[in-house]
Amino acid sequence: TRMDIAKKKIIEFVDSLAKLPDIQLGLRCYGHTTLYRPDRNCEDTKLEVPFDAAKSNAALIKKRIQNLEPMGTTPIAYSIGQSASDFPPLDSFNNRILLITDGIEECQGNPCQVSLELQQKKIIAKPYVIGMNVALQDQHQLDCIGRFFNAESPELFLKALYTAFSDMQYATTAQVYLLDDFQKPTETDVLMSFYDPEGIERYQWIHTLSNLGLPDTLILNPRIPYTL
């Protein structure tokens, strides 16, 4: 089944993280303790393995994943909201949620709004969402939560896990093109600032162009969503 394949790939992924320093992991699950019928439990979510150094709790996470069985509904919004209290009291912009799901919200919640609120409160940075072959017409309900990957095969699922992790850990680059009245990128020598979701200035540069008309390449923290 899709769940069996996902569990196998997640265990491989956790195995690799256990070898890295300065990584903390936790495991929250949903829809796994109460049967879907006769009554849906829209609060069916639990922090199964609290955050700790990956080398310390990777074995616990792998064991819990191995024994995990889907039983109930999909309370994504409620689960994201509950995860706010899961994280240790460290730099909140390092707090990341990696949501894995084979479906969409089933409990009338708004996971996109909950995700945005937690980002605005600086509890988490932008989440990552991996859908397990989610139908095209449903993907828009997930890609507003955070960066979305739709894994249509086991290979793409594992690739999505590592791509998300790489984005979480390493800096990224960007170029800013300032357009003139004719929609040409000729404007330059302008002071520009990058702001986090709370309006706090994170970076400030003077925009310049090279002799080839290319803007500077900027190095940014990928954990923060910016406005310019």
Residue ranges and their predicted role:
Residues 1-5, 11, 15, 19, ...:
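Exposed acidic/Ser/Thr-rich ligand/metal-binding surfaces
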Residues 101, 130-132, 177-190, 195-197:
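Structural motif
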Residues 190-213:
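Short amphipathic beta-strand segments in non-cytosolic proteins
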Residues 209-228:
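Short Pro-Gly-centered beta-turn/loop motif in secreted/extracellular proteins
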Residues 137-179:
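C-terminal helix of von Willebrand factor
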